[in-house]
């Protein structure tokens, strides 16, 4: 019989004097009794036997086996070995899925599909981790929900990454993340856009640079400069200005502030006299340094002007207009008593001016109609009363009691009358006026009665 020391022939030989081979768990060598072979030949024989045996009971090496027994580079082992969890957080996994998508947005199901296709560990554990993905999408500000468009049917909303959160990972490494991203509050988001929609241009607009702008505001005493941080045209939107919602000067009379002369401004004031007051203002001096009327020089006139809201000397106007009692008015101003309302004097002047324009004689409040049996006597009485109203009553009130040609002395009644208070003088003037009218009427009635007796 042919014998050979070749181990391969020994395995296939039906009659063999050599004992059976023993297989080691780690590919050990086979030992044969009675065969003198070297250590190298025994090792080669053991490797050949391992190739011919079933490998189902062979454990994969720690570094990974060959073929199907080896694991992939994502931390997963073979189908029969334990799977290793990837070292990425859920935020990193979601960011990976969104950034690799063509439109940079995915639904929840699309994010889960990407994670399972990339990491077999999560495919084996699905769907236990799906709720964790959903919670991270809702609770982190770096992810934004995008509603579906009307023409894009489907289930669920899209999720995208906030553009300001793209650099939340250090150097693009998903293993290292900076501190948690917080979204800045935006002023455009309101619960009621219909209410705040008209005001949105104010805070959506970019800030206006704080550049000082000077503009003149005309007033009664001249022009004054005001410094503002920016032009009002930069603050208010043009559409709102066109609608005059924020035009605070829309109802103001702009022409009132355009005149440069003080006389033009006061001609448009409602309390100024339209008739006699125009001539009075023309006669007034325009310089504030000139002496006023009775009751003080330039100092008193200047002091009264700043106390009064009107930019003219009231005592000077009263003196030029011939208003009764202007000396007492000037004394009150010089004594620091403040200013008085000129409407008391303007009412009478307006009444007289309107009466002159209409051409009637009803403006004289002292005119009296007296009835008698003789029309001729009535005409005489009417003419006499008219003459008293037009001639005597327009004279200074002192002339009703004293003659105008009489010279006043220190002990005369006229001097004592001038020294009395204004209220007492006014009451005496009214009483004297009524007395003269009653005397005149009684005189005419007495003449009419005597003529009737003579005719009888």
Swiss-Prot record:
It comes from Drosophila melanogaster (Fruit fly). This is Fork head domain-containing protein FD3. SMART domains: FH. The gene is fd59A. Disulfide bonds: none annotated. Residues 1-29, 55-80, 280-305, 351-392, 404-429 are annotated as: Disordered. Residues 84-175 bind DNA. PROSITE patterns: FORK_HEAD_1, FORK_HEAD_2, FORK_HEAD_3. It is found in: Nucleus. One of its GO terms (molecular function) is DNA-binding transcription factor activity, RNA polymerase II-specific. GO terms for cellular component: nucleus. Residues 351-364 have a biased composition (Acidic residues). Residues 64-80, 289-298 have a biased composition (Gly residues). The keyword Ubl conjugation does not apply. Keywords: Developmental protein, DNA-binding, Nucleus, Transcription, Transcription regulation. During embryogenesis, expressed in neuroblasts derived from procephalic region, ventral nervous system, thoracic sensory neurons and brain cells. Involved in development during embryogenesis. One of its GO terms (biological process) is cell differentiation. Residues 1-17 have a biased composition (Polar residues). Its main location: nucleus. Pfam families: Forkhead.
């Amino acid at each position: 019989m042919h014998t050979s020391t070749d181990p391969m022939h020994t395995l296939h030989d039906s009659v063999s004097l050599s004992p059976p081979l023993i297989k080691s768990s780690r590919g050990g060598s086979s030992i044969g009794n009675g065969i003198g072979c070297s250590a190298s030949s025994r090792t080669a024989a053991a490797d050949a036997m391992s190739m011919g045996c079933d490998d189902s009971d062979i454990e994969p090496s720690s570094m990974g086996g060959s073929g199907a027994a080896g694991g992939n580079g994502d931390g997963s082992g073979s189908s029969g070995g334990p799977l290793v969890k990837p070292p990425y957080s859920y935020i990193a996994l979601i960011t990976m899925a969104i950034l690799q998508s063509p439109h940079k947005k995915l639904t929840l199901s699309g994010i889960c599909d990407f994670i399972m296709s990339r990491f077999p560990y999560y495919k084996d554990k699905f769907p236990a981790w799906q709720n964790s993905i959903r919670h991270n999408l809702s609770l982190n500000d770096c992810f934004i929900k995008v509603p579906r468009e009307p023409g894009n049917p489907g289930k669920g909303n899209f999720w995208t990454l906030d553009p300001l959160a793209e650099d939340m990972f250090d150097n693009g490494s998903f293993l290292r993340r900076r501190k948690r991203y917080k979204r800045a509050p935006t002023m455009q988001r309101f619960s009621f856009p219909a209410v705040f929609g008209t005001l949105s241009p104010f805070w959506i607009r970019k800030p206006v640079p704080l550049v000082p702008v000077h503009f003149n505001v005309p007033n009664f005493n001249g022009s004054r400069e005001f410094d503002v941080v920016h032009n009002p045209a930069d603050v208010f939107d043009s559409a709102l200005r066109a609608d005059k919602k924020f035009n605070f000067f829309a109802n103001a009379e702009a022409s009132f502030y355009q005149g440069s002369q003080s006389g033009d401004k006061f001609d448009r004031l409602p309390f100024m006299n339209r008739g006699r007051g125009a001539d009075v203002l023309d006669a007034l001096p325009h310089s504030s340094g000139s002496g006023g009327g009775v009751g003080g020089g330039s100092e008193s006139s200047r002091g009264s002007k700043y106390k009064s809201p009107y930019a003219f000397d009231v005592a000077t106007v009263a003196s030029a207009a011939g208003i009764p009692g202007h000396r007492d008015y000037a004394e009150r101003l010089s004594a620091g008593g403040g200013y008085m309302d000129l409407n008391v004097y303007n009412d009478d002047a307006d009444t007289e001016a309107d009466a002159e324009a209409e051409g009637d004689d009803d403006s004289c409040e002292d005119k009296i109609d007296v009835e008698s049996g003789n029309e001729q006597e009535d005409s005489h009485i009417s003419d006499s009363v008219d003459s008293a109203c037009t001639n005597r009553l327009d004279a200074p009130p002192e002339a009703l009691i004293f003659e105008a040609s009489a010279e006043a002395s220190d002990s005369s009644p006229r001097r004592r009358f001038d020294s009395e208070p204004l209220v007492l003088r006014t009451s005496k003037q009214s009483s004297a006026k009524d007395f003269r009218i009653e005397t005149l009427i009684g005189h005419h009635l007495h003449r009419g009665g005597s003529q009737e007796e003579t005719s009888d």
